[in-house]
Amino acid sequence: MEADGDGEELARLRSVFAACDANRSGRLEREEFRALCTELRVRPADAEAVFQRLDADRDGAITFQEFARGFLGSLRGGRRRDWGPLDPAPAVSEAGPETHDSEEDEGDEDAAAALATSCGPASPGRAWQDFQARLGDEAKFIPREEQVSTLYQNINLVEPRLIQPYEHVIKNFIREIRLQSTEMENLAIAVKRAQDKAAMQLSELEEEMDQRIQAAEHKTRKDEKRKAEEALSDLRRQYETEVGDLQVTIKKLRKLEEQSKRVSQKEDVAALKKQIYDLSMENQKVKKDLLEAQTNIAFLQSELDALKSDYADQSLNTERDLEIIRAYTEDRNSLERQIEILQTANRKLHDSNDGLRSALENSYSKFNRSLHINNISPGNTISRSSPKFIGHSPQPLGYDRSSRSSYVDEDCDSLALCDPLQRTNCEVDSLPESCFDSGLSTLRDPNEYDSEVEYKHQRGFQRSHGVQESFGGDASDTDVPDIRDEETFGLEDVASVLDWKPQGSVSEGSIVSSSRKPISALSPQTDLVDDNAKSFSSQKAYKIVLAGDAAVGKSSFLMRLCKNEFRENISATLGVDFQMKTLIVDGERTVLQLWDTAGQERFRSIAKSYFRKADGVLLLYDVTCEKSFLNIREWVDMIEDAAHETVPIMLVGNKADIRDTAATEGQKCVPGHFGEKLAMTYGALFCETSAKDGSNIVEAVLHLAREVKKRTDKDDSRSITNLTGTNSKKSPQMKNCCNG
């Protein structure tokens, strides 16, 4: 049995030795052994000790006999291993340095055992090669192949059951890498195509510019050549004329000479002298003319040289213009790319806005269907709480829950708002009531809103105001009650709303609770009814923009003003939000368009565009955040840069109710006199408010609206929206703006 066991051990050792002998030389060199131990995470000192123990003949290589003798001795256990005649086993009874040798022997044995276990019959190197062969050409996509192969061999040695999952992981990685490489190639091809297209466009532009330059150069040369030829032809004609005159003079002189020969000298001496004098004078005149002609020729030559220099300068300027045009082309391409990015972002925002709008309309339609299923008309359902109207009594419109006698009165007021035509006049006359919009932020320009207002005028008259009116009708993007045409409603509709009574009893479960609080500075109801009759004919909407850093409470301020509500966790404004509010300013009914801008840095450019046509600005800061107060100067500079004229500004210190609490907690707060000084510096109004308890909200808006009305009365050319009804027409400039 012992012999059979030794035979099996020798067979295993032979397979292990064959796996370690990579070059099939029958000998393990020192470098091969070190590389094998490095892959197996064996310390270099232990690897050297194991090699020295196995290398019995000290020839620098291990044969199979030495390998088998050393490992058989370690596998048989104990301290009785036969290490050969050159290295006898150490004595157990001795102390001192021999104990240290014994510890080294144990370390060598552990390293040898690890080597024997790792290089078992399974042959991890061969398994890795087989796996690579199965992969085929995909093996070249393996990143860091050496580390992957080492981990593969270690897993094969420690836990062979994990080999198959590991192979699946490697295949998945290879598949992903191939996909990534394919995508990178496609991207490279697309980039190359774009570059080629840009190069073609640039080359076409260069060719066009070259053609234009050549045409201009040819035209200039042709003109200069024509002018030079004309000048030379003039000079040639003058020269020929003068030569002809000289020839005629010479002929005359010859004739006179012949005549003088024929006549006697005594008779003609005086005449000849006179003729000679005349001819000499004429000769001098001709010489003078010749000199002038030569001077003109020199002057024309200098002009020709100047034209040549001008032509050279124009050529240089043309080259410079070409360089500038190339730079402009590059800038234009960059701007086009930026515009495409902005258009993509704008489309995404519009898509999200449409999705939110459709979700809101679906929710309202589901609510209406549930009402029809339960045989409950929308007219008997409370949509939202509103201030109480009591006929034509002269009591004030104050919103006080303690003054209500029962839930039935509150339900009656709420049910009166279900009729869209009656609800419009009701909401306009009540100061603390909200002017609803979609509730969604929008990035549209105010001019687009004017076009939709005209469309809403036409559509609002066609809606029935009976029981069939659904809540989805007021959930459109710009279906704001205050924008509807109020002139067609008349005072009779106002009276009908004030005299409206419920058709049936309303349960307590239908009453909607809210966090609304009473707002001060309200006018009596009778005054509002009288103001309705005066303001139907001429009603203007003033554009008020809310600005300030993020999280200063602009949306809460607007919600408290329009809806008389306060919500703790309100979402941040994306882009711009819009509300309408009607106030009584100096006894006149005034409609305000309130634009809530986002305070984040990425929306600053959008907010800046709304300052251009703003009639007034509510500039908010947080009294518990000093940074928002320090940024007020930057906001004021932005408003002054965007607005063409001086815009009234109301500086509002919000969150005044929590300033003392924040100060006790150690936060750096902004005192009230700091805000007053800053407002005096810029000539602005100042007020501290609290959107949570509603203090000074309406007062701040009233003061700003009063200042806006004063400014607009002095300057009628301000950009305001005329809401006088269907009889009023838009100005040509507004039509061109909306229809362009």
Curated annotation (Swiss-Prot):
Residue sites binding Ca(2+) 1 per the record: D21, N23, S25, R27, E29, E32, A61
Annotated InterPro entries: EF-hand-dom_pair (IPR011992), EF_Hand_1_Ca_BS (IPR018247), EF_hand_dom (IPR002048), P-loop_NTPase (IPR027417), Rab (IPR050227), Small_GTP-bd (IPR005225), Small_GTPase (IPR001806)
Phosphoserine: residues carrying this PTM: S377, S383
Protein name per Swiss-Prot or TrEMBL: Ras and EF-hand domain-containing protein
Locations listed in the record: Cytoplasm, Perinuclear region
Lineage of producing organism: Eukaryota, Metazoa, Chordata, Craniata, Vertebrata
Function in brief: Binds predominantly GDP, and also GTP. Acts as a dynein adapter protein that activates dynein-mediated transport and dynein-dynactin motility on microtubules.
Region (Disordered): 82-110, 376-403, 713-740
